[in-house]
């Protein structure tokens, strides 16, 4: 595997493009508007600059990594790559449409991966004629720092596809751990109910955010409290994942907190909107 395309130049997409280029892959980062890819490239350049400043990589290596990244607003530029990693918003119809298009554009042996954090890989694969070569590659945010890639096998994902993607993730310096397709996979099936429970304790007046987060940080050795983490992830994303769990597992223990729904409706999404459980 020599070349990778990343669909989406946002926070996750540009992070994936960066770590792939730093690992020696030739990368094409694709989005629907030139301004989006320009913003993504600017983010990568800033990130590489910080790594050089911290002496975690040389200027020569940073320049080489940047040179391996090209950009495009045409998905047909993915036609010759070995692996595509999709990193667009968590909307099944959008992902299915992109995978259907990529299935027609990409060479038959190309692997199509999704960075989805909760959407069924098997459902995404149904939009293609290569379900054995469709897989989940759930990178964690921020991608250049976090060491895990959660690999999700769909119902028809082949062992060869899994092995190839695990090897690619490891080449990027990540630990790749695999699971089978299920709502929320492992990471968010366990994490998001905890975040939701923290929101419920706030909703019920049990404690204020500083106390809730402080108890989990100091008492449970969490590096960040659940409410601050919810703000970092985005409250709209947390709500989406809770809805996926609630509907997919058909269990009311996954019902999202009313406070979470209210805050999302009010546009209080966390860091990205400037206000969530904290102000930024």
What are these regions (language model features)?
Residues 25, 79, 142-152, 223-224, ...:
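Acidic/polar active-site rim loop that often engages polyanionic ligands
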Residues 21, 29, 65-83, 167-173, ...:
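Amphipathic alpha-helical segments at domain termini/boundaries
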Residues 2, 23-25, 159, 163, ...:
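NAD(P)-dependent Rossmann-like dehydrogenase/reductase catalytic/cofactor-binding core
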Residues 111-180, 188-189:
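Rossmann-fold dinucleotide-binding core
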Residues 13-15, 95, 117-121:
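Short glycine/serine/threonine-rich phosphate/pyrophosphate-binding segments
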Residues 7, 30, 72, 87, ...:
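Structural motif
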Residues 36, 50-111, 119:
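Rossmann-like NAD(P)-binding element
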Residues 1-50, 54:
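NAD(P)+-binding Rossmann beta1-loop-alpha1 motif at the extreme N-terminus of oxidoreductases
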């Amino acid at each position: 595997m020599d070349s990778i395309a990343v669909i989406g130049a946002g926070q996750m997409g540009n992070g994936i493009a960066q770590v792939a280029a730093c690992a020696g892959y030739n990368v094409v980062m694709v989005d629907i508007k030139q301004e989006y890819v320009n913003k993504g490239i600017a983010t990568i350049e800033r990130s590489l600059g910080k790594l050089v400043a911290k002496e975690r990589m040389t200027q020569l290596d940073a320049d080489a990594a940047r040179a391996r990244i090209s950009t495009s607003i045409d998905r047909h530029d993915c036609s010759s790559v070995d692996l595509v990693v999709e990193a667009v918003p968590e909307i099944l119809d959008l992902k299915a449409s992109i995978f259907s298009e990529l299935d027609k554009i990409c060479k038959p042996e190309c692997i199509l991966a999704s960075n989805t954090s909760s959407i069924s890989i098997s459902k995404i694969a149904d939009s293609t004629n290569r379900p054995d070569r469709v897989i989940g590659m759930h990178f964690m945010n921020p991608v250049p720092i976090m060491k895990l890639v959660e690999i999700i096998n769909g119902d028809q994902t082949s062992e060869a596809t899994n092995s190839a993607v695990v090897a690619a993730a490891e080449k990027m310096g990540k630990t790749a751990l695999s699971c089978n397709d299920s709502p929320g996979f492992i990471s968010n099936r366990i994490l998001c109910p905890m975040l939701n429970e923290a929101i419920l304790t706030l909703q019920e007046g049990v404690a204020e955010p500083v106390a809730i987060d402080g108890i989990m940080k100091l008492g449970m050795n969490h590096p960040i409290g659940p409410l601050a983490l919810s703000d970092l992830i985005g409250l709209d994303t947390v709500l989406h994942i809770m809805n996926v769990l609630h509907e997919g597992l058909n269990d009311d223990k996954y019902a999202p907190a009313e406070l979470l729904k209210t805050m999302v409706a009010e546009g209080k999404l966390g860091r990205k909107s400037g206000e969530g459980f904290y102000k930024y």
